[in-house]
Amino acid sequence: MLTAEEKAAVTAFWGKVKVDEVGGEALGRLLVVYPWTQRFFESFGDLSTADAVMNNPKVKAHGKKVLDSFSNGMKHLDDLKGTFAALSELHCDKLHVDPENFKLLGNVLVVVLARNFGKEFTPVLQADFQKVVAGVANALAHRYH
């Protein structure tokens, strides 16, 4: 999946990420850009407009929770399937989330990182993070196979 150099680069960069801010923005953007994903978050209250979604405290809190899990995965890049096994089971068996949504969220996360870090988020880092989010999406979809 990732070379030792790529792992070092993404891990070092991830230390700069403000998980609470980036998580809320990434989940919010997912819900705005792909509105069908909102059906999994009906208990979150008002998701009727982009502003409502982006300012919703439950979206922000869950986005942080999602990125806290992602951060844990960043510490276990060699065992993403093991790291995300319980979450894969939850999302498959109980929540019935379409695994394609994991790919969408990963891609949105990469966009949010680029937006927040500008030139510091180089094309090489973007390519490395695309590998990471693909690996995480695959690990989360593992239970579906």
UniProtKB/Swiss-Prot annotation:
Residue positions where S-nitrosocysteine is found in the record: C92
Record's keyword annotation contains Translocase: no
Residues recorded as bearing N6-acetyllysine in the entry: K58, K81
Residues noted as binding heme b in the record, renumbered to the chain: H62, H91
Residue stretches making up the Globin domain: 1-145
A cellular-component GO term for this protein: hemoglobin complex
UniProt keyword annotation of Transmembrane helix present: no
InterPro entries: Globin, Globin-like_sf, Globin/Proto, Hemoglobin_b, Hemoglobin_oxygen_transport
Tissues showing expression: Red blood cells.
Post-translational modification Phosphoserine, affected residues: S43
Effect of D20G: In allele D-Zambia
Phosphothreonine modifications at: T11
GO molecular function, one term: oxygen binding
Job of this protein: Involved in oxygen transport from the lung to the various peripheral tissues.
Oligomeric form and interacting partners: Heterotetramer of two alpha chains and two beta chains.
Membership in a protein family: Belongs to the globin family.
UniProt-recorded name of the protein: Hemoglobin subunit beta
Name of the gene encoding the protein in the UniProt record: HBB
